[in-house]
């Protein structure tokens, strides 16, 4: 297998590098570094990506996308991370793929253009006081009366709920089913009566996360994503593809950024090399490992382009 980028892919990388040099300002980087998560300047930058069609790089053309292979999204995300700013976009990475998979025609028509432009901010509402890494143990309930649903419960550690227009909410719709089978997904307008967002302030004054209280918030049946009680499978499918593309690219880009800073530090401080003669070997070892990870990611992306799931 040839692990090199094709001429077209390499040209796209160069285009991304040029764009980031012009549009990814120091102010955006500092905001992200301070918050550790997207802020207002970051979301303005995402809208610029949307204007170039780069939020829909891999979307099918029928949904207004460019229909590019997954490697193009990987390239963009990696280049951002190499500059100290991770690509974090719940709308594009979780919401849009799920809507394409199981959304109604009306949901696709309404929400996909908002995702493509970057105009709407979406928050993930998964974690709860008693359901963190064990998502299937969530307790927030969505009771149905035939015409719609009433949502009640609490969500924790949502990173963008304070800025979000909409939320992607995992809720329990069947209390008697096995815990993985009684979950449904809803799209919730954050202005819905009964929704309250409060910052979770750490001992260090960090305000990056929020808790969300949902008290008898009413949504119509059109807010249900796909089939009732199938939410767990929709979440799992979306996360598989996200880990294989943006997740891997962010990790590799971040590590490349840190290694490059380490190299610059050593160059600027010769005494460090004298005091730690094995440092050169350690740094080169990390750089080699990163290249191996990049090649493994390219292999997975190649499988995805061939129609295989990333867990193949």
Predicted regions and their residues:
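Glycine-rich phosphate/pyrophosphate-binding beta-alpha loops
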Residues: 131, 156-161, 203-204
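Intrinsic disorder at enzyme termini
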Residues: 1-13
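A short core secondary-structure module
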Residues: 148, 152-198
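A structural signal for short hydrophobic beta-strand segments in well-ordered beta-sheet cores
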Residues: 140-143
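Internal helix-loop-helix
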Residues: 43, 50-119, 159-166, 290, ...
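C-terminal helix-coil-helix/basic helical segment that borders enzyme active sites and/or dimer interfaces
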Residues: 28-36, 267-280, 291-312
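Glycine-rich beta->alpha junctions and the first turn(s) of the following alpha-helix
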Residues: 5-7, 195-295
């Amino acid at each position: 297998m040839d692990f090199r980028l094709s001429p077209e892919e390499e040209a796209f990388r160069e285009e991304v590098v040029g764009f980031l040099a012009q549009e990814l300002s120091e102010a955006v980087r500092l905001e992200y570094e301070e918050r550790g998560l997207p802020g207002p300047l970051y979301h303005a930058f995402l809208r610029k990506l949307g204007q170039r069609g780069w939020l829909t790089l891999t979307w099918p053309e029928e949904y207004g996308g460019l229909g590019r292979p997954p490697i193009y999204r990987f390239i963009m995300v990696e280049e951002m991370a190499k500059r100290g700013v991770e690509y974090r976009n719940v709308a594009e990475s979780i919401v849009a793929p799920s809507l394409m998979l199981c959304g109604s025609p009306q949901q696709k028509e309404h929400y996909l253009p908002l995702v493509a432009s970057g105009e709407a901010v979406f928050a993930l509402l998964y974690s709860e006081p008693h359901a963190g890494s064990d998502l299937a143990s969530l307790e927030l309930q969505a009771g149905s009366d035939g015409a719609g649903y009433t949502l009640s419960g609490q969500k924790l550690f949502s990173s963008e709920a304070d800025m979000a227009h909409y939320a992607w909410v995992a809720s329990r719709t069947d209390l008697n089913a096995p815990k993985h089978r009684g979950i449904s997904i809803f799209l919730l307008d954050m202005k819905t009566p009964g929704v309250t967002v409060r910052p979770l302030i750490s001992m260090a004054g960090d305000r990056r996360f929020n808790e969300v209280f949902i008290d008898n918030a009413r949504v119509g049946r059109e807010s249900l994503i796909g089939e009732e009680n199938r939410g767990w499978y929709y979440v799992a499918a979306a996360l598989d593809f996200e880990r294989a593309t943006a997740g891997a690219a962010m990790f590799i880009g971040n590590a490349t950024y840190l290694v490059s800073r380490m190299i610059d530090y050593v160059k600027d401080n010769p005494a460090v090399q004298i005091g730690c003669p094995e440092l050169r070997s350690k740094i080169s070892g990390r750089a080699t490992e990163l290249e191996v990870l990049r090649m493994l990611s390219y292999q997975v992306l190649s499988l995805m382009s061939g129609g295989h799931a990333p867990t193949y």
